[in-house]
């Protein structure tokens, strides 16, 4: 019976540690992505609660949307010339 309690609390501890780790890695704004993950030559972007590196082929976002997001504006189109409007 004692071993069942120890196993239960060990399992509970591991589950709670896993949940804390998942929520710590989430981002809500671009500032949460500073100094996270692998090296990236440009500022990381928070996209769908995950930090991504918008560089080259690593990102599926068009460069125009990334530029507008850094300016805190909304992208008008994804093509050149890039147009941004206020949100």
Swiss-Prot record:
Where does this protein reside within or beyond the cell? Secreted
Q: Which domain of life is it from?
A: Eukaryota
Q: Which GO terms describe its biological process?
A: defense response to fungus; killing of cells of another organism
Any S-S bridges, and between which cysteines?
27-46, 33-51, 40-53
Q: Where does the UniProt annotation place the signal sequence?
A: 1-19
> Which keywords annotate this record?
Antimicrobial, Disulfide bond, Fungicide, Plant defense, Secreted, Signal
One GO cellular component assignment for this chain's record is:
extracellular region
Entry's family note: Belongs to the DEFL family.
The name on file for this protein is: Putative defensin-like protein 304
Organism source for this protein? Arabidopsis thaliana (Mouse-ear cress)
């Amino acid at each position: 019976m004692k071993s069942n309690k120890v196993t239960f609390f060990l399992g509970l501890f591991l589950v709670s540690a896993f949940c804390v780790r998942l929520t710590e890695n989430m981002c809500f704004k671009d500032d949460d992505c500073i100094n996270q993950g692998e090296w990236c030559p440009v500022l990381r972007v928070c996209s769908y609660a995950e930090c991504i590196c918008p560089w080259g082929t690593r990102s599926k976002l068009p460069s125009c949307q990334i530029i507008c997001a850094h300016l805190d504006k909304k992208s008008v189109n994804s093509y050149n010339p890039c147009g941004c409007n206020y949100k």
